[in-house]
Amino acid sequence: MIQRVDGARVDADDDEVGVIDGPGLLLLVGVTHTDGESQARRLANKAYDMRLFDGDSGEVSAGDLGLPVLVVSQFTLYADTRKGRRPTWDAAAPGPVAEPLVAVVADELRARGAHVATGRFGAHMRVSLVNDGPVTIVLDVD
């Protein structure tokens, strides 16, 4: 999930672990069992190239503008709520699978020249953001 923001931060265990000041992207990354490095790289590139910002020549991407990205893992994106009142997380990949793929997303963005801040994988996090628009989009790379 991608959000266009005017600033965002993530705290874990009462510590600020990632922050972007001003315009940029908040990328909430969920990983499922069938995801791999290829999907992680495509997600990073698609997010950074998505034209969500106004520029002098029309709509431009975070990559065009050199904007920062806050990457936060979020297994709850794969919640299954079809039965009952209690979500299940069976579709979310386990930590040993998901953590390196979230790192691939961040590394791919850095390779593109983005300033990347991250959350702390597996921690209870508090994410604060100013959603601009609001623009919130579910990205799918399959």
Residue ranges and their predicted role:
Residues 1-84, 100-142:
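N-terminal, polar/charged subdomain of small-to-medium soluble alpha/beta proteins
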